Amino acid sequence: MTRLFLLSLLMLFSMTMSAQSADKLYEEGKRLYDLEQYKEAVPKLQAAADKGHYKAQYRLGRCYDKGDGVKENDQKAFELYLKSAKQDYAKAMYQLGRCYMKGKGVAANQEEAKKWFKRAINDIKHGDDILKDLRKAKADGEEATRILTLIGKNK
């Protein structure tokens, strides 16, 4: 019985340390990314993303989406956004909607785009910010208008 308890405790400690190191890797990668040191940021973000860190998956997806520090790869960006979005990260849901709307890294599918945009906007933390940004951008670009029309928020 004591062995089982110690084994459980060891596993819990191991998972906690792994999560902490993923957070540290992400924070270092984000710091480098914000300094526009993309090539240095990518390995840190990749390591954190491999550990399941949703923000690292999103940020690494942005790197592949824009070609920051890596060769642009729409399919890889889509896959990373999807992993992050499945962990309920609104920013990734929004980017996933854009991928489906434009057919970037995946076949264009307006219904899937609409679904992901709505999920992003309904997110308690980030949804209002996304909606405000879209409405502000509407005056400057047709993409924002297209997204707002697609989700029925074009008022």
Please tell me what each predicted stretch does.
Residues 4-13:
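Sec-dependent N-terminal signal peptides
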Residues 22, 121-155:
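Terminal, low-structured helical/coil segments at or just beyond the last alpha-helical repeat
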Residues 24-32, 59-66, 95-102, 136-137, ...:
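Hydrophobic face of amphipathic alpha-helices that form TPR/SEL1-like repeat modules
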Residues 21-40, 44-47, 51:
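Alpha-helical segment of the N-proximal tetratricopeptide repeat
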Residues 20, 32-33, 51-53, 66-68, ...:
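Short helix-capping/linker turns of helical repeat alpha-solenoids
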